[in-house]
Regions:
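SAM-dependent transferase fold signal centered on methyltransferase-like domains
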Residues: 1-202
Length: 202
């Protein structure tokens, strides 16, 4: 993702402005990529309340608003991190990287696996800015990575809890990936496996 200097300045100057109003003013700022600016401003505004330790790092890049609203909060990520530690860690459903970023601090080496190239690009940019140079980025499907990876101390998965039409799933087996099928392999590849699932799946 490339953001011009003028757009970066605009983002900084308008970081607290209403993004809906800004989106309607693109003609006033022809040298600004307004779509990118609005995405980043909205992302920082969500981060201010959801990931407060990230907010002061102005150079971070953020995904579209829906991804920000759906990602883990700093508070829940810190709780997960408090339960895990060791030498090697892998997050097979990396997403925006909130969980990976906080959990990985308790490990010497970490692997972030995500099949969406756009999210991998954000992780590649953001992790070094957060002092997380020990995380390796893999733009791959988590299941195929799991099948080939070396064993680790801990695996983390956050299965998608919505179907292809956007509806919420009810059974764990309906989530993506289906961890009920992967269970033998997960146990074989890690000393500990942490899954993030919704209340409806318990």
């Amino acid at each position: 993702m490339e953001i011009s200097t003028k757009t970066l300045h605009f983002i900084e100057e308008h970081r607290e402005d209403d993004t809906r109003t800004l989106a309607l003013q693109s003609k006033k700022y022809p040298d600004v990529d307004m779509a990118a600016a609005v995405t980043q401003i909205a992302g920082r505004q969500v981060a201010a309340r959801k990931i407060p330790s990230w907010y002061p790092v102005s150079a971070l890049w953020y995904p579209p608003h829906l991804s920000m609203e759906q990602c883990s909060s700093e508070a829940t990520a810190l709780y997960k991190a408090s339960l895990l530690e060791g030498d090697t860690f892998a997050d097979l459903t990396g997403g925006f990287g909130i969980d990976c970023s906080f959990i990985s601090r308790n490990f010497k080496q970490a692997d972030y696996v995500e099949r969406q190239s756009g999210l991998c690009e954000l992780a590649l940019h953001n992790f070094p800015l957060l002092g997380l140079g020990h995380i390796r980025i893999h733009n791959r499907d988590g299941v195929s990575y799991l099948q080939e990876m070396l064993p680790v101390d801990c695996l983390f998965l956050d299965p998608a809890r919505r179907d292809g039409h956007g509806g919420k799933t009810v059974a764990i087996s309906d989530c993506e990936p289906d961890v009920t099928v992967l269970e033998p392999l997960l146990v074989d590849k890690a000393k500990k496996v942490m899954l993030k699932i919704g209340r409806a799946h318990v």
